[in-house]
């Protein structure tokens, strides 16, 4: 294990974090708020630790898949801890568990909160909550790789460990160029949404924070009623962009290079569109009886369907009061998630397609045992290694869900609350049902349960494997001499 190089990369993450923390400081200063001091102190702490870790570049640059997973897991934990500092130092979230929960929820783009009154927070803290969504949406290491080629030719190990979906590929030959293209598209879409929200009469602050939260498919609102207090125009703009950010970013790259044929052939995109369309129509019909018209029902249904399937978590209504069929569909969408290569959480559409095709092939093999079965996705053959990884993902996901559920149920809360709380955090959705519904929060859970949720949020955002590897004892078995050498080099 190359501890020296892992520490070096984490140091650069903290250096960038120190710079990120200065942005909400400017917001606090603009509104003449005391929270600006908290961001300055937090920035200095992050920069100090970061510079300590990066003052000496390690000579050993051997970096493999194991180091990639460990670096990503530790990097996100370090990012979350430093991101919690402004909440604690400002005194606006004085409890350590709550501050860390809010920070992890922000970076993992979950949007679950322990706060009952977000409108009481300062503008700087509100901006920081939304900004953590934007930082975490595309991935902090993706951003760092845009600026610094830290791992030289081994950047793919970092990208693979952090990127959402069963596999990650290059849009262009160089991994760093791929990262820059992805972030360019990400930033451009964020700006376009913000401009459209301004046209709808939103204030500049509201438009910026909402755009940041939508882009990361996070869902931290700046109003206690989430998006319910805004006009239908604004709600529709947000709904459309939630859908847009749930699409694989490769599709937008194909648009830029003018390859419409490949876009139209995308099986994942067509499945995503189909699920959103069917779910919207079914829910609209199911709730239309209690609303003024079918058009209002369609608007509300489309907003909530896109919000949940993309794991953004914004809400315009309290869907806790919707019929059971509608709630059942929303819970199902929590697990599905958006497309691979998007900022969405959840299992991902591509994994579901691969698992479904593999299941059909296995059933078919009983009837035709000698037939060669091939799985194809987006016109390409899916390798056996990818199929195995998808199968392993589902098994690991189920075990993690069951284990988390067991620990949460120790508190004796309602089954509906506990089940959807795990689903909402592990899939990075945010709101669940009952006690963790769209108008509720996670503040009432014990520190143990909050730790379970925090682990689930990180595991869900990082596609399970990095967090599992981090806590696997066999990974850390190494020759004592090598470990001492690497740690000495890191310091």
What are these regions (language model features)?
Residues 1-491:
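Membrane-proximal intracellular helices of multi-pass ion channels
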């Amino acid at each position: 294990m190359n501890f020296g190089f892992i520490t070096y990369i984490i140091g650069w993450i903290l250096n960038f974090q120190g710079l990120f923390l200065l942005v909400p400081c400017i917001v606090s200063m603009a509104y003449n708020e005391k929270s600006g001091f908290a961001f300055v102190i937090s920035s200095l702490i992050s920069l100090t630790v970061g510079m300590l870790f990066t003052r000496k570049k390690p000579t050993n640059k051997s970096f493999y898949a194991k180091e990639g997973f460990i670096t990503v897991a530790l990097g996100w934990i370090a990012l979350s801890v430093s991101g919690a500092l402004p909440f604690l130092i400002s005194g606006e979230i004085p409890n350590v568990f709550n501050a860390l929960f809010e920070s992890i929820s922000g970076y993992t783009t979950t949007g679950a909160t322990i706060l009952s009154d977000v409108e009481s927070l300062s503008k700087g803290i509100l901006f920081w909550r939304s900004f953590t969504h934007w930082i975490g949406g595309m991935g902090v290491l993706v951003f760092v790789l845009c600026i610094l080629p830290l791992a030289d030719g081994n950047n793919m190990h970092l990208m693979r460990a952090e990127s959402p979906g069963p596999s990650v590929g290059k849009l262009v030959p160089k991994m760093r160029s791929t990262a820059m293209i992805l972030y360019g598209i990400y930033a451009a879409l964020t700006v376009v949404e913000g401009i459209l929200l301004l046209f709808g009469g939103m204030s500049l602050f509201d438009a910026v924070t909402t755009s940041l939260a939508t882009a990361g498919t996070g869902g931290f609102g700046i109003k206690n009623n989430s998006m319910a207090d805004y006009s239908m125009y604004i709600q529709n703009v947000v709904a459309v962009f939630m859908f847009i950010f749930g699409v694989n970013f490769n599709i937008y790259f194909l648009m830029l290079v003018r390859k419409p044929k490949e876009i139209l052939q995308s099986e994942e995109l067509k499945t995503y569109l189909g699920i959103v369309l069917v779910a919207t129509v079914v829910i609209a019909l199911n709730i239309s009886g209690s609303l003024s018209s079918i058009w209002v029902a369609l608007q509300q249904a489309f907003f909530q369907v896109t919000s949940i399937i993309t794991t953004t978590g914004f809400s315009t209504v309290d869907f806790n009061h919707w019929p059971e069929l509608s709630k059942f569909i929303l819970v199902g969408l929590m697990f599905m998630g958006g497309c691979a290569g998007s900022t969405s959480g959840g299992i991902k559409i591509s994994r579901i397609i691969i698992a479904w095709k593999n299941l059909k092939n296995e059933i078919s093999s009983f009837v035709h045992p000698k037939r060669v079965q091939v799985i194809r996705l987006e016109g390409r053959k899916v390798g056996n290694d990818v199929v195995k990884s998808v199968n392993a993902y589902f098994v690991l996901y189920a075990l993690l869900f069951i284990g988390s559920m067991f620990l949460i149920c120790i508190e004796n809360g309602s089954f509906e609350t506990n089940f959807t709380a795990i689903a909402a955090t592990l899939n990075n959705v945010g709101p669940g049902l009952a006690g963790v519904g769209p108008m509720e929060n996670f503040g009432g859970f014990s520190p143990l349960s909050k730790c379970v949720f925090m682990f689930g949020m990180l595991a869900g955002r990082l596609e399970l494997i990095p967090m599992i590897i981090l806590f696997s004892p066999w990974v850390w078995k190494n020759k004592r001499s090598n470990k001492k050498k690497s740690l000495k080099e890191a310091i």
